[in-house]
């Protein structure tokens, strides 16, 4: 059964219950898009829907990438699920889910995302400024 909270979903990604169909394109978002997604989430803005397919049939899939390194080509290991495994395949929302997974549980180019949610406006920057370090 899918857990519909953010961290429940991220844990299911980490535990290989929510996976990407083999035909999905690679992750392409840059760190500014990831930061803007997190900023929207923190401000309570809608960030779009995710479409999952709960399949009991054998499917070819790949796991989410937790640590993104844009300096090397992305290489994927394609796996096959057993019939009845009940995997959830992401049909729409891969870029957003990967971004959330990287932001909260992984790294982007060997850096961890930090969000400045306590300071006020400084140098024309929006409060809640974000950066990778």
Residues covered by each model-derived region:
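Basic- and aromatic-enriched surface patches that contact anionic nucleotides/nucleic acids
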Residues: 1-133
